[in-house]
């Protein structure tokens, strides 16, 4: 059996998140999907797995809602469903940053495409000859599985620790073009906005994150795999899962709790 795994997020105003959660739960259960959907007033964040027809039908239904017509979905395949359950949760944020003054609903920070970034990585500078710094917005557990070559990493265990950890390195970044990246892009939607509001106007976000980069240009300039928060553990640049049973067992325990 071939399972389709999807990841998607969209920042959009949702005035009745619980109503939407109930609708998504009903459609997802009927389709036999597994995974997690987070909904907040600021938008939606989805990690879902299922058979091809069920996945296609679910996203066709969801994207028929004008609020989600622009939803961009990333796809990969596996031989099993990497999630044990189907969960739909209403949260204060679809990605916790705890900076109430930062909202992608008010406008996105500028980004760089995967193809352009690959060219910059080859040259070691941007189109204006300015040195390039890759800034990893993920935590240390994720980074251990792989990151961009020479990337700046921060000693954080949670995304909410990003602003405090970055403060020690700001002076080192003042003369560079900084490209912030994460798994699929959602964390950088907030991190880069915060950095620019905080006076760092030389920062961009990698459109689509690491997984989008893998999908579009492969693994050039990247060392290792990309950690994902499910039973696949990590994906290589061809989006193939890693089988690390120690981590799978740990994930299974967290799913039960």
Swiss-Prot record:
Sequence ranges assigned to domain Rhodanese in this UniProt record: 128-222
UniProt entry tagged with the keyword Oxidoreductase: yes
InterPro entries attached to this UniProt entry: Rhodanese-like_dom, Rhodanese-like_dom_sf, TrhO, TRHO_N
Record carries keyword Amino-acid biosynthesis: no
Record GO biological process: tRNA modification
SMART domains: RHOD (SM00450)
Active-site residues (renumbered): 182 (cysteine persulfide intermediate)
EC number of this enzyme: 1.14.-.-
GO MF annotation list: oxidoreductase activity, acting on paired donors, with incorporation or reduction of molecular oxygen
Keyword vocabulary terms for this entry: Oxidoreductase, tRNA processing
Catalytic activity field: uridine(34) in tRNA + AH2 + O2 = 5-hydroxyuridine(34) in tRNA + A + H2O
Top-rank taxon, per record: Bacteria
Family note: Belongs to the TrhO family.
Function of the molecule: Catalyzes oxygen-dependent 5-hydroxyuridine (ho5U) modification at position 34 in tRNAs.
Listed PANTHER family: RHODANESE-LIKE DOMAIN-CONTAINING PROTEIN 7-RELATED (PTHR43268:SF3), THIOSULFATE SULFURTRANSFERASE/RHODANESE-LIKE DOMAIN-CONTAINING PROTEIN 2 (PTHR43268)
Record protein name field: tRNA uridine(34) hydroxylase
């Amino acid at each position: 059996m071939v399972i389709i795994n999807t990841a998607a997020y969209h920042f959009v105003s949702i005035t009745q998140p619980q109503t939407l959660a109930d609708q998504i739960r009903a459609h997802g259960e009927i389709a036999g999907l597994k995974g997690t959907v987070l909904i907040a007033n600021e938008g939606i964040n989805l990690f879902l797995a299922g058979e091809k027809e069920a996945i296609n039908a679910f996203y066709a239904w969801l994207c028929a809602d004008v609020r989600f017509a622009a939803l961009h979905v990333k796809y990969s395949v596996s031989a099993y469903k990497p999630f044990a359950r189907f969960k739909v949760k209403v949260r204060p944020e679809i990605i916790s940053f705890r900076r109430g003054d930062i909202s992608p609903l008010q406008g996105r920070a500028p980004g760089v495409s995967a193809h352009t970034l690959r060219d910059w990585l080859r040259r070691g500078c941007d189109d204006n000859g300015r040195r390039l710094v890759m800034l990893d917005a993920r935590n240390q557990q994720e980074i251990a599985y792989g990151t961009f070559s020479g990337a700046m990493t921060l000693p954080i265990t949670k995304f909410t620790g990003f602003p405090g950890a970055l403060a020690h390195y700001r002076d080192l970044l003042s003369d560079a073009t900084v490209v912030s990246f994460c798994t699929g892009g959602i964390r950088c939607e907030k991190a880069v906005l915060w950095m620019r509001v905080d006076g760092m106007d030389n920062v961009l976000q990698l459109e689509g994150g690491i997984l989008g980069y893998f999908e579009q240009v492969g693994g050039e300039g990247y060392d290792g795999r990309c950690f994902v928060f499910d039973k696949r553990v990590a994906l290589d640049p061809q989006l193939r899962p890693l089988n690390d049973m120690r981590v799978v067992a740990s994930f299974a325990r967290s799913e039960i709790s």
